[in-house]
Amino acid sequence: MNAVTDLKQDYLVADINLAGWGRKEIAIAETEMPGLMAIRDEFAAAQPLKGARIAGSLHMTIQTAVLIETLKALGADVRWASCNIFSTQDHAAAAIAAGGTPVFAFKGESLKEYWDFTHRIFDWADGGTPNMILDDGGDATLLLHLGARAEKDQSVIAKATSEEETYLFAAIKEKLAKDPSWYSRNLAAIRGVTEETTTGVHRLYQMAQKGELRFPAINVNDSVTKSKFDNLYGCRESLVDGIKRATDVMIAGKVAIVAGYGDVGKGSAQALRALSAQVWVTEIDPICALQAAMEGYRVVTMDYAAEHGDIFVTCTGNYHVITHDHMAKMKDQAIVCNIGHFDNEIDIASIEKYEWDEIKPQVDHVKFPDGKKLIILAKGRLVNLGCATGHPSYVMSSSFANQTIAQIELWQERDSGKYPVGVYTLPKHLDEKVARLQLRKLNAQLTELTEQQAAYIGVKKEGPYKADHYRY
């Protein structure tokens, strides 16, 4: 990929001439994103994000373009990079760059370019710093915290344990050589972060528990209208889209192994079963395993499943769920892919020594010593974004409405003391608001409680209707 940067412009995209195409698709997406567009309309006049300078690290797709333009419509200044080397839609990036937003993203970035671009979202053209982060997976948040630690003690970036860390540590060392206080200066300016996904939320809670987190964070992922919709219904549609575009495989009759039965795993299993695959599930959590069994899925271990499966999908957010030994046991032509956030769910590093034959972008044949070949999709990264275009606009509207509300909440309350350093979730009434806005598109008719009914169950007539501990 020969990415293009115009020296007169503060962006780096694959081809700025794709902007017209991107703009047309953005216009279509807006009609499918009722919640996000309603929030844009509601708050545009008040400009609740005026003064906010948001460093965004999230998949640079058409749907994200609508989010970026919503943040700007509400008064924010924005700089953007993708949170995945394969997830950018180049026409979306071009449209956003052509509209005047600094964006650094193209499909097929190298890891060196990825960390360069993540640094660039913190380098404002006027020499200033951002004051907010909008993150997906936690890389932007990690970068500042780790870099600030390395300013004091470079031993924290001395020993890389993965290819990803090798490039991250090298990027931090290079930045420190040029500007020894760059990370702490940017870190001190951040007033809060909103985090999109399960993996990033895990990182935030770990940092908070260790006392390492330096600013307040809102966990957008655990808003009901995010995790129970984006993670479940989004994956239910985009997983098979990615597998089909990549391989044209017939799903029916195949044994499909779904590793993990959280919301992402549930949606993935539903999608594969809907196309008549025989779905097996692996799980560590007895509650999730029981849910899978009660839905009629066979619950097995990966050690057992490895030699039987035709299609393998990891959905755990964990490390080395599929190991080299598992892949060595798999059938010839088995399809292996991941719909969790990072590529280390599958031990890709252990098979890099073998012969790789690229069939087409993000589809590789990997030849094992015994002559067997596996089909590896998106090099173990997100299959739905690497091999297709990710979740549909409608379901992303829920997620991005929550992101926008969370950015407004943190920015408006930045000096109030409401959010000391820690990890928070949005209140139930805002979750319900997003759901109401989304329902308009579906021509749904909500039943209204009478005053007597509301009193009987002990809620307000206008909601919220469930306690915070309620499990949807």
Swiss-Prot record:
Principal cellular location given in the protein's record: cytoplasm
Annotated cofactor note: Binds 1 NAD(+) per subunit.
GO MF annotations in UniProt: adenosylhomocysteinase activity
Compartments where found: Cytoplasm
Annotated Gene Ontology cellular component terms: cytosol
Chain positions recorded as substrate binding sites: T61, D136, E196, K226, D230
TM stretches of this protein: none
Enzyme class: hydrolase
The protein's annotated pathway: Amino-acid biosynthesis; L-homocysteine biosynthesis; L-homocysteine from S-adenosyl-L-homocysteine: step 1/1
Enzyme Commission code(s) on record: 3.13.2.1
Gene3D superfamilies in alphabetical order: Adenosylhomocysteinase-like (3.40.50.1480), NAD(P)-binding Rossmann-like Domain (3.40.50.720)
Record-level GO BP terms: L-homocysteine biosynthetic process; one-carbon metabolic process; S-adenosylmethionine cycle
Sorted UniProt keywords: Cytoplasm, Hydrolase, NAD, One-carbon metabolism
Residues annotated as binding NAD(+): 197-199, 231, 260-265, 283, 318, 339-341, 384
Catalytic activity, reaction form: S-adenosyl-L-homocysteine + H2O = L-homocysteine + adenosine
Cofactor: NAD(+)
Function: May play a key role in the regulation of the intracellular concentration of adenosylhomocysteine.
Family listed: Belongs to the adenosylhomocysteinase family.
NCBIfam families attached to this UniProt entry: ahcY (TIGR00936), PRK05476.2-3 (NF004005)
Name of the protein: Adenosylhomocysteinase
Lineage: Bacteria, Pseudomonadati, Pseudomonadota, Betaproteobacteria, Burkholderiales
Annotated gene: ahcY
